[in-house]
Amino acid sequence: MLFRYLVWLFRFIEVKNVASISLLVIGSNSLTTAISNNTSTTILPTTSSNSLMTAIPNNTSTTISPTTSSNYLTSAISTNISDKEEDTPFSTDKTVFDGLSPITLYRTIRSTLNDTSTKTMTDHILTRPYRPTTVIFHSDTPQPVKNATQGNIIKKTYRQVLTFFIQPNPLFPCFKNHEVFLNLANILNTILCIILIKNV
């Protein structure tokens, strides 16, 4: 299944003519992967570790930020996330809830748009040192996207990626709506990336 997903993913990237991609590493407590000494733009997954950890040590690639994982679900968060409804939230999805909610992910992504430093914060069990490059997000209304000239197209592209997992999918019949983001994180953790589209 993972191989079929990867084939779809890279075909999707090719069709959308993505100029460049970067990585947002997501660790989880169910899937573990290690990539060591990556010195090129090629990502070569190695044998999974027995410990609940994901690591990219000694990484010199310009598209990957070195980071260290923990034994629970982790993601990129800067220090300026608040509980105020200052930003336009994700589309309301009553089936996605608890700590890993759309609004939490939305604030996480929005908070990294103009952040050029590596910061760490804990919010809804999400924490990750991360140096963002280009970030896209899913929203019902137009919002600024760093280094992007076609924000609406980028958001539409990202929406399609999410929809691929949210809708009933023969590749992943075990998916349940309320588990979609957790499962998505687990799958993306296996290949160690979320697509961050730049200059589409």
From Swiss-Prot:
Keywords: Late protein, Repeat. Signal peptide: none annotated. Transmembrane segments: none annotated. It comes from the Viruses. Induction: Expressed in the late phase of the viral replicative cycle. Sequence repeats lie at residues 28-48, 49-69, 70-91. Belongs to the asfivirus I196L family. This is Late protein I196L. It comes from African swine fever virus (isolate Tick/South Africa/Pretoriuskop Pr4/1996).
